[in-house]
């Protein structure tokens, strides 16, 4: 590996404050360019998500409409920040974005949203957060920084989980490719059940697989 002497992206816009971080890059055949979804804002934990494009992966053009994804003030679980997204390649006309949301106490959960073009009209999952800790769990204070792999049977999602003492790597598994979004034009139903992160839509098998 040969590192470049200077960063390929720096914060220079008002919303970016002092930080650009958590890059997630896809090569887009239709656009014939790289697209980067990135987080920006304060140090350590960013505030919102932006997008940029590049032909060579070095020189990036930030979108004039950034940030493209910001906290929803009507949803307490993500009222503080949204950041550290993982965007799956387009499938059946949709980009699916797994993202970190933080509440007013900076407790982190994983949410899911989708968009036709990967930039505009993001539709949040009606049962967000789709993966959340609960009192007494090994990952109660934070589930974040998802990394997602599509398999023959559905999805595997690895994440950072923490409980203010340890930070560990967890795994969530989803059977099938129907992620539970409502049909277009419908509002959908919140299926979170008892609010523990283990009911209804949270049909993920969660487990700790590594400690570091």
Predicted features and spans:
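Carbohydrate-active catalytic/glycan-binding domains of CAZyme proteins
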Residues: 1-212
